């Protein structure tokens, strides 16, 4: 039996993901992380919005919420305030997080709420038919951009840093070892931890732009990734089309829920 199965709702299998989808890689990395941290199913709550990646919590053997489009961070905030003893993990995608959920993303970072947000970024809307998302690279094709997108792309990690997150990292599905380490750090971080995972979507993004073969897409992700330390010495032209990976931020500052409960206790004593 696969070691991850004990952490999964086996009655929900088989999953709905397309063959070669990166969601399974990310889910496996997450399960490895909680196993290495010795986190039991009753110790964490998984929250998601709408989209392919948002189906991940439905397969996890834990308490979970499958919420409305773009709102998982809002729901997760309420959970963390009510149950600060629980690890709260949000699974989201580039459309769910950066488009309709952009406001919640910004203010979750700003408040520095103790959440671990894992964004599986496949550069496209996968579940609804391959439309352009906020992270679709300039010039890349989608069903709503058959001649190539003319929109500027959003850098999710830069947004998280600017908005106030305390841990920010980016990897791809071709970096599972590094991803496990970052998920562990994110869960242990007392504050808003944002982990972006650039993932393959062979059904839409790959078929339109790279290859419909998952192995080709993972090879592409690996070969086009540049570590942050190397990227610092490269020009903007040299970085064009590359994926900068690594840990961008790891700092400490007051966490929202702790500050809220301190205020409550202070007011009780007055």
UniProtKB/Swiss-Prot annotation:
It catalyses: 2 oxidized [2Fe-2S]-[ferredoxin] + 2-oxoglutarate + CoA = succinyl-CoA + 2 reduced [2Fe-2S]-[ferredoxin] + CO2 + H(+). GO terms for molecular function: 2-oxoglutarate synthase activity; oxidoreductase activity; thiamine pyrophosphate binding. Keywords: Oxidoreductase. The keyword Signal does not apply. Its EC number is 1.2.7.3. GO terms for biological process: organic acid metabolic process; sulfur compound biosynthetic process. The keyword Signal does not apply. InterPro entries: 2-oxoacid:Fd_oxidoreductase, THDP-binding, TPP_enzyme_TPP-bd. PANTHER family: 2-OXOGLUTARATE OXIDOREDUCTASE SUBUNIT KORB-RELATED, 2-OXOGLUTARATE SYNTHASE SUBUNIT KORB. Heterotetramer of the KorA, KorB, KorC and KorD subunits. This is 2-oxoglutarate synthase subunit KorB. It comes from Methanocaldococcus jannaschii (strain ATCC 43067 / DSM 2661 / JAL-1 / JCM 10045 / NBRC 100440) (Methanococcus jannaschii). The gene is korB.
